[in-house]
Amino acid sequence: MTKKQKKTLKRIIAAAVLTVLLALLFHFVELPWFVQLVLWLVPYLVIGHDVLRKAFMGIKNGEAFDENFLMAVATVGAIGCGEYAEGVAVMLFYQIGELFQSYAVGKSRSSITALMDIRPDSANLEAEDGSVSVVDPDDVPIGATIVVKPGEKIPLDGVVLTGESTLNTAALTGESRPRTVRPGDEVISGCVNADGVLRIRTTKIYGESTVAKILDLVENSSLKKAPVENFITKFARYYTPAVCIGALVLAIVPPLLLGNWLDWIMRALTFLVISCPCALVISIPLTFFGGIGGASKRGILVKGGNYLEALSKTGVAVFDKTGTLTKGVFKVTHTTPADGVTEADLLESAALAESFSNHPISKSLREACPGLDAKRASDAQEIAGHGVKTQVDGRTVLAGNARLMESEHIDYTAAEGAGTIVYVARDGQFLGSILISDEEKPTAGTAMQGLQAQGVRTVMLTGDAPAVAELVAKDLGIDEVHAGLLPADKVAWVEKLLAQKPEKKELAFVGDGINDAPVLMRADIGIAMGALGSDAAIEAADIVLMDDDPAKISLAMRISRKCMRIVYQNIVFALAVKALCLILSALGITNMWWGVFADVGVMILAVLNATRMLNVKEYQ
């Protein structure tokens, strides 16, 4: 609890004790009305002086119609009608509800504050003479050398100069997978250095670092309100004056016709207590705040409640392939040696033949067969569109596509697979084929199933060859695929899909944020995946996934849909209970105690329901 909340709790306890004592006193002792009034005013002012002050200031500033005004009029009116205990009790329960609401908001803010803990407090700046001084991260320039000790947060983005360590990225990604860094590796701010001492050369000032951008994004997320939040705010602006006029009419018109002024005034005051819109005005923003906070704990950064609401309406999810559904790293995934040839001989021959090439395919072959002596290869000849011809240990080795085998009159066995096939021959003899492909991410298939289970149609757009794209789409269970696309073609396809999408449904585009900025901004919801350290992704996207896990997309959608379910539950529940109690109040069936339940009770239940968004465990 905060200091202010503790002070309010003490006032509530003091007022509650005084109320109970006075109720017992007047049960056994008969005292004049003016003595009772003076005694009841003590607990009333202890618990309600701040509400009265706020109501007065609201009237003074021309903003009278709020919950403070409603409570002040209702309780002062009840005391004026001689219902001292009810007037004090209404104010007491209202303050209990306000304290509960304040505590719930504080709890939801703490989920954001936990993310705020990634902000580094200081940086160890190394001078030219080797001395180290502790400075504010804002004071560290680009190109400076900082020292990060074990257990400390990396304060600024940079490159490791010396040292080797393991970084904990859990605060940024929501996952506790460690990452090993060595000299030459890039590191980003907000990660925790687990073991070794690192010397880092800074590449950005603090204001432009990853951690500063993330904090700015989360802190400003509450400014972008969801349409339903804006509706509730506008609703309350007209609703409160309307119920005040209704209460005034209820207090004046019926007694002019039927008499019994005191009874109708009490009905009108109960009407005011019931009509307070606290349950909606507080619980709806709290639900969105809790949803954004809960998502941030899992490494899903949502830029505002409007994007969370839009995500819940997603009907079509469009994916880029490379780097989003696949790892974007070429790797030897399958080998088919010819009869009498070992896999080791096949890979070694191909790796040595490709030892002079910088092509990604060549690199993947060398990685599959590390530790080879490149001096064994010589006279490498690259044949455009075919492959390479290299002398290895004095023998001619060919490595390339089917056209190379045919042009060199090699009797080869054709192979099939989702990726690039490299055929290898030595001195005219076919050695076998090697399949090199972009490896699918382990959770990509699960992510597609999760989205389809939520009624979302999945589409993949890629620049890859149709055969490769079709195999990946079939393997992952994607509904629709369009291949061989240039970046401009992807934008055109998104435009087409936007025109085809069902009414009241949204289109989400998921990319790695590197070449996808135009499409991310054109889609209804742009989701950048693997944005850890990617400025372009954080800027262009509406929702940012800090790691490379496609399953987070399905998770984000579940969070958004749960958020909207809770919002609509609270709206229906609050309006239904209040409408019923308002009718009963106008008919004289309910009293002020019913009003307390319809206001404070409904608010507490709605806030409790809203705080369910903070429970991220059930999303796992």
Feature-to-residue mapping (PLM):
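N-terminal membrane topogenic signal
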Residues: M1-A16, Y239
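Conserved ATP-binding TGD loop and adjacent catalytic N/P-domain core of P-type ATPases
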Residues: V392-G394, T420, R426-Q569
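Actuator/coupling domain of P-type ATPases
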Residues: T2, A23-H27, W33, L39-E126, ...
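Membrane-embedded transport module
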Residues: K501-K504, A541, M546-Q620
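P-type ATPase nucleotide-binding
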Residues: K149, V332-R457, P466, D475-V494
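Bilayer-spanning, highly hydrophobic alpha-helical transmembrane segments
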Residues: A15-L18, N230-W261, R267-F288, Y568-F597
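Conserved catalytic phosphorylation-site environment of P-type ATPases
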Residues: A72, L172, F231, M266, ...
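Juxtamembrane helix-loop transition segments at the membrane interface in multi-pass membrane proteins
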Residues: F56-F65, F100-T113, L286-G305, T611-Q620
